[in-house]
From Swiss-Prot:
Cellular component GO terms held in the UniProt record: cytosol
One MF annotation (Gene Ontology) recorded for this entry: 4-hydroxy-tetrahydrodipicolinate synthase activity
Name the UniProt record assigns to this protein: 4-hydroxy-tetrahydrodipicolinate synthase
Keyword terms, alphabetized: Amino-acid biosynthesis, Cytoplasm, Diaminopimelate biosynthesis, Lyase, Lysine biosynthesis, Schiff base
InterPro entries: Aldolase_TIM, DapA, DapA-like, Schiff_base-form_aldolases_AS, Schiff_base-form_aldolases_CS
Pathway: Amino-acid biosynthesis; L-lysine biosynthesis via DAP pathway; (S)-tetrahydrodipicolinate from L-aspartate: step 3/4
Site location (Part of a proton relay during catalysis): 49, 112
Family: Belongs to the DapA family.
Superkingdom per UniProt: Bacteria
Location within or outside the cell: Cytoplasm
Gene from which this protein is expressed: dapA
Length: 296
């Protein structure tokens, strides 16, 4: 079956808030979920790249997803990030996400071991066949060192519970090819804040956004205008965020977004090694962006 809940528009790639010692701050997590519900965010991705999935162990990974689902209390869909570079581990994470009530799962391509296209196809196929939950592919070759080719996505799109893809290549030609060639009920999400509005105007269904952690109302409005094919309003709403979109990636995500949210008073300044607190030079740039937007 195709998806039966409304995963379109602005989907936040939520941070995992931490105390200064790196332990998880579940109190702040609860407040962030409420913040997004109140701000018009359409869904939350829990434990993705922005959520520091790489530095949390598997028990913590599941506990953060479980808490996010509990705090949401069915008021907003929760997409659990359950990808891994081991197919068996991805299956176990996806099974756990289904049991605790996730609405869908986001599965990054296996990283580091660099599978072939056939290996990628078999990886996703087995997960989909093993766990009956809606699944979204996630292609981010800049991080994984492997690119999920359009032809492989087309093959995977024929599997019933693979419902869409997050394309974080930032290449609108790739987006165009995907949108033109896949079935109408296959969902396309931008994973690149800088090009997300244009991606949606081309026929995408939404964006999984880092910037939405800071400006959820503006991102939600820009994406909604784009979904309505109102280019002028979509672009004018998004334009003030252009510098922020860029500077949130001046160092590796989620370093800049976590510092920006700390500066806003939304969370503590905790982050886990090997990631470190944002450098002073980058802090000055982001602080100027936040000031220009009237956030601080």
């Amino acid at each position: 079956m195709r998806i039966n809940h409304p995963l379109t528009g602005s989907i936040v790639a939520l941070i995992t808030p931490m105390f200064d010692d790196g332990s998880i701050d579940f109190g702040v997590l609860k407040s962030l979920v409420a913040f997004h519900i109140d701000s018009g965010t359409k869904a939350i991705v829990s434990m993705g790249t922005t959520g520091e999935s790489a530095t949390l162990n598997q028990d913590e990974h599941i506990e953060v997803i479980r808490a996010t689902i509990e705090f949401a209390n069915s008021r907003i869909p929760i997409i659990a990030s359950t990808g891994a570079n081991s197919t068996s581990e991805a299956i176990e994470l996806t099974k756990a996400a289904k049991v605790i009530g996730a609405d869908a799962c986001l599965l990054v391509t296996p990283y580091y071991n660099r599978p072939t296209q056939e290996g990628l196809y078999q990886h996703y196929k087995l997960i989909a066949e093993t766990v009956d939950i809606d699944q979204i592919l996630y292609n981010v070759p800049s991080r994984t060192a492997v690119d999920l080719c359009v032809e492989t996505v087309l093959r995977l799109s024929n599997i019933d519970n693979i419902i869409g893809i997050k394309d974080a290549t930032g290449d609108l030609n790739v987006a165009k090819a995907l949108i033109e060639q896949c079935a109408d009920d296959f969902l396309f999400y931008s994973g690149d804040d800088a090009t997300a509005v244009e991606f949606i105007l081309m026929g995408g269904h939404g964006g999984i956004s880092v910037t939405a952690n800071i400006t959820p109302k503006q991102v939600a409005s820009a994406y909604q205008f784009a979904l309505e094919n109102d280019r002028e309003l979509a672009e004018s709403t998004n334009a003030p965020l252009a510098d922020l979109h860029q500077h949130l990636f001046i160092e590796s995500n989620p370093i800049p977004i976590k510092w920006a949210m700390f500066k806003m008073g939304k969370c503590n300044n905790g982050i886990r090694l090997p990631l470190m607190i944002l450098s002073q030079q980058a802090q000055a740039m982001l602080e100027q962006d936040l000031s220009n937007l009237g956030i601080i």
